[in-house]
Amino acid sequence: MAAEVIAAAITDIELMKASQLGLKGIAAALAVGLTGLGTGVAEMSIGSAAVGATAENKDIFGLALLFTVIPETIVIFGLVVALLVLFS
């Protein structure tokens, strides 16, 4: 009788740990996925404007490249958050 109760408690603890790991995985995927989606939407308008401006004036290529790279740092922040969630 006591062994069955202990076995049930151990099974419940294992299920809670597995559920927690699954939720951590979902949170990490959302962190990277949503930041990637947001960056893609931002790059859509910034990239086309940068290419158009560079086509008109070749001297602003460096500035256009800088404005194109800035939104990509958002994905790096999402990746850092995902790693913190997974390994905490």
Give each language-model segment a name.
Residues 1-88:
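Hydrophobic, small-residue-rich transmembrane alpha-helices and their short perimembrane loops
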